[in-house]
């Protein structure tokens, strides 16, 4: 797992913005940049739909890969929920990054079935007393897929290739980051994709990416519960 992919295993921790300070840890500058840009993308869609002055806070928690995320899931959930640091814990990981040693998703044909199986597995390792305040979501197949919803932001010579398939239909044999690297010749998350997150309209990606929609609408639902 490279340092630029570590952010994929962050979990959104809802907290009352006025009561709790930011829990963002000191992390490497590239990882911090990625987390900040992703949060801005989320808040650009979430905040306008909440009452004035009632924004919720979302704090990313860093993990070193999906295996580390799974190993620490139970402990981290207990840590943040037991002492009131968070109201809810929301997990977001790359679907294609889940180790087959944990759950072999190749036995499931559709993306929907893979997600159902992966979510069921992750919920099974969460103690029952926390499950009502835990949500697990997936980037299909990577966060970069969301940015494929904006072909106009990429060089003209590659736009036709980007629009040939729906963003979340980029398959596991060539996930979005590899696809972008192939068609662009060079691709670096922190200097290419992350520069797009703050300036694009999240609704465009939400309309084109059903599993991103599930994630964002779940965040909105939880945020409204805190009002």
What role is predicted for each listed range?
Residues 22-25, 29-32, 36:
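Long alpha-helical, hydrophobic tracts
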């Amino acid at each position: 797992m490279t340092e630029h992919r570590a952010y994929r295993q962050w979990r959104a921790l809802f907290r009352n913005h006025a009561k709790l300070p930011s829990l963002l840890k000191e992390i490497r500058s590239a990882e911090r940049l990625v987390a900040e840009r992703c949060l801005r993308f989320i808040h650009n869609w979430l905040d306008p739909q909440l009452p004035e002055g009632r924004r919720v806070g979302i704090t990313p928690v860093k993990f070193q890969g999906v295996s580390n995320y799974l190993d620490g899931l139970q402990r981290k959930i207990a840590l943040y929920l037991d002492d009131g640091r968070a109201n809810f814990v929301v997990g977001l990981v790359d679907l294609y990054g889940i180790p087959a040693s944990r759950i072999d998703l190749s036995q499931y044909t559709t993306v929907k079935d893979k997600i159902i199986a992966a979510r069921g597995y992750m919920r099974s390792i969460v103690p029952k007393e926390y499950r009502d305040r835990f949500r697990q979501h997936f980037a299909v197949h990577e966060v970069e897929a969301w940015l494929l919803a904006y072909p106009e932001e990429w060089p003209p010579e590659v736009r036709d290739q980007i629009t040939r398939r729906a963003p979340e239909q980029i398959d596991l044999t060539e996930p979005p980051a590899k696809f972008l690297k192939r068609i662009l010749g060079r691709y670096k998350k922190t200097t290419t994709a992350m520069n797009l997150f703050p300036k694009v309209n999240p609704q465009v990606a939400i309309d084109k990416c059903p599993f991103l929609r599930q994630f964002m609408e779940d965040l909105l639902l939880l945020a409204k519960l805190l009002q």
